[in-house]
Amino acid sequence: MRYGEMEVKNFNPEEIEVWPNRNDRHYTIKITLPEFSCLCPRSGYPDYATVYIEYVPSSLVVELKAIKLYINSFRDRHVSHEDSANEIYDLLYKKLSPKELYLKMDFNPRGNVHTIIEIDSKKN
């Protein structure tokens, strides 16, 4: 097993690394992760998506390698589009307690179906 595979396999989402936000001003962090993949819980076929995260931090920010490893940890999991989006959103909201959080997952079309899931803290 190569070092990258080991990092992803051993990644514990509950230990996702966060850092103190040293800036008092209101600002938005935008992160795009274009290589999300998981397995369809029904067929086992791979699903691919681009993950868009936007948040206004309060006291914490997420470390970028940690979010990359977390997203990559879905690669061999059988999980629905809806569940993966909500799981990612819930973990980020729990760990960061941001002032605002928006998550969008734009899944590649498969079987003539294109799915986009959006979750917005301003609407919840």
From Swiss-Prot:
Compartments where located: Cytoplasm
Keywords: Cytoplasm, NADP, Oxidoreductase, Queuosine biosynthesis
GO cellular component, one term: cytoplasm
Binding sites annotated in the UniProt record for substrate: 62-64, 81-82
Pathway involvement of the protein, from the record: tRNA modification; tRNA-queuosine biosynthesis
BP terms from Gene Ontology: queuosine biosynthetic process; tRNA modification
Catalysed reactions, as listed in the record: 7-aminomethyl-7-carbaguanine + 2 NADP(+) = 7-cyano-7-deazaguanine + 2 NADPH + 3 H(+)
InterPro entries the record matches: GTP-CH-I_C/QueF (IPR043133), NADPH_dep_7-cyano-7-deazaG_red (IPR050084), QueF (IPR029500), QueF_type1 (IPR016856)
Domain of life: Bacteria
EC number from the UniProt entry: 1.7.1.13
Principal cellular location given in the protein's record: cytoplasm
Record-level Gene Ontology MF annotations: preQ1 synthase activity
Active-site residues from the entry: 40 (thioimide intermediate), 47 (proton donor)
Annotated Gene3D superfamilies: 3.30.1130.10
Family per record: Belongs to the GTP cyclohydrolase I family. QueF type 1 subfamily.
Role of this protein: Catalyzes the NADPH-dependent reduction of 7-cyano-7-deazaguanine (preQ0) to 7-aminomethyl-7-deazaguanine (preQ1).
PANTHER family (UniProt xref): NADPH-DEPENDENT 7-CYANO-7-DEAZAGUANINE REDUCTASE
Name by which UniProt lists this protein: NADPH-dependent 7-cyano-7-deazaguanine reductase
Natural source organism: Wolinella succinogenes (strain ATCC 29543 / DSM 1740 / CCUG 13145 / JCM 31913 / LMG 7466 / NCTC 11488 / FDC 602W) (Vibrio succinogenes)
